[in-house]
């Protein structure tokens, strides 16, 4: 019987990156936290879905907190100490994710809201009737 060879993909080299940028994309359905270096190369990322939440629970502040903690842990392993935070989107996990990054041990130097605002672009989705 043929044995399947164990695949070992290209391992990311552990590098020492002292400061970077945390991108928090918070929608009503999910929160994605990506931490990059100053050049834009992603160091660590996590999301509410990757943290084990499913369905409507992905949009909760607690799910955003868990995702931010997981991303911060991976970034701290790479030697990150200071971050700038760029927040995008209207979701409920915005503030919670920022607080979780701070509690995890990352020093926040800047918080900026980069939510895209349309100058009367696409038509909005129709109103929900429940």
From Swiss-Prot:
Annotated GO CC locations = ribonucleoprotein complex; ribosome
Recorded protein name is Small ribosomal subunit protein uS11
Segments forming a coiled coil: none
What is the annotated role of this protein in its UniProt record? Answer: Located on the platform of the 30S subunit, it bridges several disparate RNA helices of the 16S rRNA. Forms part of the Shine-Dalgarno cleft in the 70S ribosome.
Question: Which gene is this protein's source?
Answer: rpsK
Q: Does the keyword Membrane apply?
A: no
In its keyword annotation, does this UniProt entry include Cell wall biogenesis/degradation? no
Query: How does the annotation summarize its subunit structure?
Result: Part of the 30S ribosomal subunit. Interacts with proteins S7 and S18. Binds to IF-3.
Which keywords annotate this record?
Ribonucleoprotein, Ribosomal protein, RNA-binding, rRNA-binding
Q: Which family does it belong to?
A: Belongs to the universal ribosomal protein uS11 family.
Molecular functions per Gene Ontology: rRNA binding; structural constituent of ribosome
What InterPro entries does this protein map onto? Ribosomal_uS11 (IPR001971), Ribosomal_uS11_bac-type (IPR019981), Ribosomal_uS11_CS (IPR018102), Ribosomal_uS11_sf (IPR036967)
């Amino acid at each position: 019987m043929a044995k399947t060879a164990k695949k070992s993909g290209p391992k990311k080299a552990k590098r020492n990156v002292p400061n970077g940028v945390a991108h928090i994309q918070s929608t009503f359905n999910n929160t994605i936290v990506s931490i990059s270096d100053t050049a834009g190369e992603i160091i660590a990322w996590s999301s509410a879905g990757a943290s084990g939440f499913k369905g409507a629970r992905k949009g909760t502040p607690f799910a955003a907190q868990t995702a931010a903690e997981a991303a911060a842990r991976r970034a701290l392993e790479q030697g990150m100490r200071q971050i700038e935070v760029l927040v995008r989107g209207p979701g409920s996990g915005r503030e919670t994710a920022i607080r979780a990054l701070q509690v995890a041990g990352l020093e926040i130097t800047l918080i900026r809201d980069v939510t895209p605002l349309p100058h009367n672009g696409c038509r909005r989705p129709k109103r929900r009737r429940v």
